[in-house]
Each structure stands twice: as structure tokens, then as C-alpha cells.
Amino acid sequence: MGTKRSSLKGSLLLLLLMSSLFLFKSVESLPICPSGAVNCQVSLSDLFDRAVMLSHYIHSPSSEMFNEFDERYAQGRGFITKAINSCHTSSLSTPEDKEQAQQIHHEDLLNLILRVLRSWNDPLYHLVTEVRSMQEAPDTILSKAMEIEEQNKRLLEGMEKIVGQVHPGDRENEVYSVWSGLPSLQMADEDTRLFAFYNLLHCLRRDSHKIDNYLKLLKCRLIHDSNC
């Protein structure tokens, strides 16, 4: 009986992993413009549809990856109390909830999303390389980290196109929050190193959730005239 349950559990986990990968590939297969197209112009509505989809598929595996790491490496270590307010993006003034976000002009909110996404380029790259070097790191964590890194680049590209349509010719300087956590990810001390991973994944989950909410709010405001 125990063998059957283990087999069923393994099959369900494999199914969930394959479903997650399928959703990522579905998003990845949606080109911004057809191959070889010249002067392609995608509607703002379509760009927002794609951005909202991408942000959702970044936040979902970010949460799963954090939960898996927490369960496997962080139990009993008291990491959560140390992780509060220690994200590298804390220097960016981000609204904490929908009510605060609604008070911000759409141009400022768009630029804020760009800054947060740019702030994750470097840490996501190093997250992938350092997870590869972890002993006994689950393949699911590595595969999610790799997918999130790729989808973050795609979302940033899409957001730049959205800003280009909403405010044509108004190019913002590439402002972002610098991450300096690589030495901590490479520490010999296990507790220090594991907390660095934990904190990075905690912040990724937090920021991906914020971006997901901001994009839904902006889509409602700019595409549906706040009628949603």
C-alpha cells in the first residue's frame, strides 16, 4: 500500500512539474512580433495581456521555489525573522497594497515596474549559477530559477514596449537597485549561505507578487478605463 501511495505521489509531482513547464512554454511561444516582420506594431491591449500572463507565470514558480527551499533547508533556522525588510529592492519606494498603488500616476508606476525588473537581472543570473553548485539541490529549484530568469528578461522587454506606446519618445534612464549579495551566496558558513538563498527567494516572491498586482491595476486603468 505504501509503495502505491509513493508511486501516486511521485506521478502527481511529475504531472505538476510538467504542467508548470507547459505553461512557461505557452507564454514563451507567444512572439511579440511575427518572425521577419518589419515595423511590427502590437496593440497596447495585447502587450498588457502578454505582460500580465508573464508576471503571473513568474510569481507562481517564485512562490513554489521559495516554499520548496524553505521546507528543505530553512526549517528551525529562524530565517523568516531576519528576512523582513532586507531585500535589495527596498531602496525603491514601492506601494505595499492595491490602495497605495491606486494613488500613483500610471507613468510613475510603469517606471517603477521597469526599475524592479532591472534590479533582478543580476541576482537571477547568479541565483541560477549558484543553485547549480549546491549539493543535492533539487532539479525543480534549478529549473524554476532558469525559467524565471528567462521570463524576467521577456517581461522587461515587454514593459519597455508598453512604456514606448504609452509615452512615445520618453525614454527613462536605466535606474535600478544594485544587488550586492553574491559573496553571501558563496560563503563557506552553511547558515550564512543558506540564509542568503532564503532571503533572495523571499524577496523574489515578494517583488514578483507586487509586479503582478501593479500590472493588473495598470491594465484595468489604461485598457479598461478603470472599469473592472
From Swiss-Prot:
| GO CC aspect terms | extracellular space
Q: Which PROSITE patterns match?
A: SOMATOTROPIN_1 (PS00266), SOMATOTROPIN_2 (PS00338)
Q: Which organism does this record belong to?
A: Trichosurus vulpecula
CDD domains, sorted: prolactin_like (cd10288)
- Recorded superkingdom: Eukaryota
Role: Prolactin acts primarily on the mammary gland by promoting lactation, mammogenesis, mitogenesis and osmoregulation.
Residues folding into a coiled coil are: none
Any Pfam family hit: Hormone_1
Task: Spell out the subunit comment.
Answer: Interacts with PRLR.
Disulfide pairings: C33-C40, C87-C203, C220-C228
Q: Which family does it belong to?
A: Belongs to the somatotropin/prolactin family.
> Which controlled-vocabulary keywords does the entry list?
Disulfide bond, Hormone, Lactation, Phosphoprotein, Secreted, Signal
Cross-referenced InterPro entries = 4_helix_cytokine-like_core, Somatotropin/Prolactin, Somatotropin_CS
In the record, Phosphoserine modifications are located at S55, S63, S119
Output this protein's name. Answer: Prolactin
